[in-house]
Regions:
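Conserved nucleotide-binding/hydrolysis micro-motifs of P-loop NTPases
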Residues: 1, 21-24, 34-36, 41-46, ...
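Conserved catalytic/switch belt of AAA+ P-loop NTPases
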Residues: 2-35, 45, 56
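Conserved AAA+ ATPase core "coupling" helix
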Residues: 45-93, 103-104
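The conserved phosphate-sensing helix
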Residues: 84-85, 95-110, 119-123, 140-144, ...
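Short amphipathic alpha-helical elements of helix-turn-helix/winged-helix folds
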Residues: 112, 150-154, 168
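Winged-helix-like regulatory helical subdomains adjacent to P-loop NTPase cores
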Residues: 126, 130-159
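Short acidic, hydrophobic short linear motifs in intrinsically disordered regions
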Residues: 156-169
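Short amphipathic alpha-helical interaction segments
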Residues: 170-186
Length: 187
């Protein structure tokens, strides 16, 4: 795929090979000028030539609690959901610095509030919903806690490789690298 993207990025054209053998020929399709924006959580999987073709690179950081609180308020407003401000503060604290998680937790808390309460997000309702989800006061879920417990107890605090931890937990190492470690390393 990268081989098709390079000439598109540099020369605004794409070459396609049609047929094979002595009947093969190349068709060149011109492209209108464009801006390519890419996003990944796994930049290391891109080849170095591909990474260096992007003129500007940025790394996104975790959101702080006030911004997550605003995101939670916006989600509640879009869902036409009543809430106590303190309930959303609790939710923002447990959102792992990620707005997409904030949105997911708002929806889960809404579902819980509609079934188990009066539909309003209160501190007690959000607390109960997050407890049901297995999310503790630090925003850690069951996998996070198992990960930390494995390093602390099974491997006596380390050092230990990710493959060994993954095998012990019965999880894929990619899951631990992509889901668990980024938050734990910045928390």
């Amino acid at each position: 795929v990268e081989e098709y993207i390079y000439p598109a990025m540099e020369d605004y054209k794409v070459d396609f090979v049609v047929d094979s053998g002595m009947h093969s020929r190349t068709i060149q399709l011109p492209l209108k000028p464009f801006t390519l924006i890419g996003a990944t959580t796994r930049a290391g999987l891109l080849s170095p030539p591909m990474r260096t073709r992007f003129g500007i690179t940025h790394s996104l950081k975790f959101w702080d609690e006030p911004d997550l609180l605003l995101r939670a308020e916006m989600s509640c407003d879009m869902l036409e959901l009543d809430y106590e401000p303190e309930a959303l503060t609790l939710l923002a604290k447990r959102s792992r610095g990620t707005p997409r998680i904030t949105n997911r937790l708002v929806r889960r808390c809404r579902d819980f509030a509609q079934v188990k309460a009066d539909g309003v997000l209160t501190v007690s309702t959000v607390g109960a919903a997050l407890e049901l989800e297995g999310i503790d006061k630090l925003g850690l879920d069951d996998l996070d806690r198992r990960f930390l417990r494995t390093i602390a107890t099974t491997y006596r605090g380390g050092p230990v490789g990710i493959e060994a931890v993954a095998a012990t937990l019965g999880e894929e190492s990619d899951t631990l690298v992509d889901v668990v470690e980024p938050y734990l390393l910045q928390a």
